[in-house]
Amino acid sequence: TASGKDMVYCDKPNCTHEGFSGSNEKPSCPAAFYGLEGAGTVLYNDHLYYVGNMSDEDMTVQYLYVMDSNGENRKKAAKLENVQNVTAVLYRDNYVIGAYSNRIELNDEGQIVNDDKPEAGIFVIDLDNYKVYMSDKITSEQANITDIYYEDEVVYYSTVRFGDDVTELMIEEGASDDAESFAYDNMLNGIYQYDIADEKTTCLTEIDHINDLRLLDGDGYYSSKDGYFVFDTESRQTRQLPIDADGKTQYGPLKKSGDFLYYALSEEKSDEVTYYRLKDDKSEELMKLSTEKAFSIASICGQSVYVTYTNDNGKLCLGVISLDELNKGVFEPKELRCFDDEE
């Protein structure tokens, strides 16, 4: 999407492009990969990189695969031990930065001895020498990394977990009664800092009774029953944002581009969604749309704004508009793909 150009994964003449499967674990097509979507193949510095485990030899190990830009000459360059599920990956300043989560514990013979040991953390791989760095882990029920951000040899990441006194049974019972209220009352949201050079993990803050913590440009944005707030990771101070949400519900996630914070609110007694951008504590209304035509911002990458919306045929779709169109209040998305009902 950055260049607007297609790239070749496989340039083999007459290749059938067979995929990876349990019966075909070594496909001849160099474009075949296997793993979670959050850790897909990335073209970076004229090489293809992929984080995953294509051999399934050990469910607690993942690898960094490096190959030519067309997928040929694939090799394992780094090993991530005690990493079960890679959930997100960034490539910055010749580093591979990723988040992972674990659930099970194995003994030395590879047998499961505990199927409920949730933990999560981040890893960093130096592409100059393939050295692996690992942060401290967070633990307790539903421990997970929700966002990662890199700047100047430091990784910031947001976490979510239940308090240490919350058991799996309590979560099941709470979810059956009122899952949203139970999560609001018992979930802990944290922001951590990992210094690569010092190999040091620091918890900057951990907050309870909030909604949807987002790590935007390294700072933590969130809402609660008291309003909207931002936690500055440099000063470690929290301040309230001048967003009037009385009688309104947030529609979609908060997003940032440059100095602007983008947000949308739907009024409880209206079928409209209003879109805003905030800068220097001043909000500007961008557009109003009916709830049937409304969209959520999935991400903002440069001048491209990726959105999810329902098309005229009632299908949930991923599309793109320009940042200039968003700022002018124009919503005429280019449809990229539509999702099936089971997706």
Show which residues each predicted segment covers:
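Post-signal peptide N-terminal segment of secreted/secretory-pathway proteins
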Residues: 1-74
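Short loop/turn segments that connect beta-strands within beta-propeller blades
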Residues: 2-4, 68-72, 126-130, 195-199, ...
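A short beta-strand motif characteristic of beta-propeller blades
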Residues: 7-9, 15-32, 73-79, 131-138, ...
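Repeated scaffold domains used in trafficking and secretory/extracellular systems
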Residues: 20-22, 28-42, 82-93, 141-152, ...
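Residue position within the beta-strands of beta-propeller blades
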Residues: 49-52, 97-100, 156-159, 221-223, ...
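Short, conserved, GDST-rich strand-edge loop motifs in beta-rich repeat architectures
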Residues: 53-58, 101-117, 160-186
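A short loop-to-beta-strand structural motif that recurs across blades of beta-propeller domains
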Residues: 63-65, 121-123, 190-192, 227-229, ...
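Blade-level signature of beta-propeller repeat domains, shared across WD40, Kelch, NHL, RCC1
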Residues: 298-343
